[in-house]
């Protein structure tokens, strides 16, 4: 192996600035690259009810613990405006119960009284 001290003696006279003539003024910082971001799939929700979805609305939705237009829209794959109208219809028929009504958010829950009345009909 050759001795290393010969190289060290040559470099010892030079300062750090002399070694890097490019970085005298600090150099240019690397540009930040933009992230690609997340791509969402386009929702293809129904604008009007078909027979199967309408039946599903009457069977399943009154059994949900938390019923909001967003929950109904996501589970039944229907538009939000259609979900709001459907929940108004269910409320009118007494299948669900209003918990809180706000300008932007309406919250319903299952009607406990309605299920008690419906249970004896199944037994008979």
UniProtKB/Swiss-Prot annotation:
UniProt region (Disordered), positions on chain: 1-37
Bias (Basic residues): 27-37
Residue ranges with Basic and acidic residues bias: 1-22
Chief location category: cytoplasm
Top-rank taxon, per record: Eukaryota
Pfam family membership, one: Ribosomal_S25
Localization: Cytoplasm
InterPro entries per UniProt: Ribosomal_eS25 (IPR004977)
Protein task: Component of the small ribosomal subunit. The ribosome is a large ribonucleoprotein complex responsible for the synthesis of proteins in the cell.
Subunit structure: Component of the small ribosomal subunit.
Protein name: Small ribosomal subunit protein eS25
Gene symbol of the encoding locus: rps25
């Amino acid at each position: 192996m050759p001795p290393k001290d010969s190289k060290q003696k040559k470099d010892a006279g030079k300062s750090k600035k002399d070694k890097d003539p490019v970085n005298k003024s600090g150099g240019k910082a690397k540009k930040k690259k933009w992230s690609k971001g997340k791509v969402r799939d386009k929702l293809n929700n129904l604008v009007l009810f078909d027979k199967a979805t309408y039946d599903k609305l009457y069977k399943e939705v009154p059994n949900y613990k938390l019923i909001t237009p967003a929950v109904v829209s996501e589970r039944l794959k229907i538009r939000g405006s259609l979900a709001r109208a459907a929940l108004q219809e269910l409320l009118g028929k007494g299948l669900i119960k209003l918990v809180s009504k706000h300008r932007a958010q309406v919250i319903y829950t299952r009607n406990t009284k309605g299920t008690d009345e419906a249970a004896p009909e199944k037994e008979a």
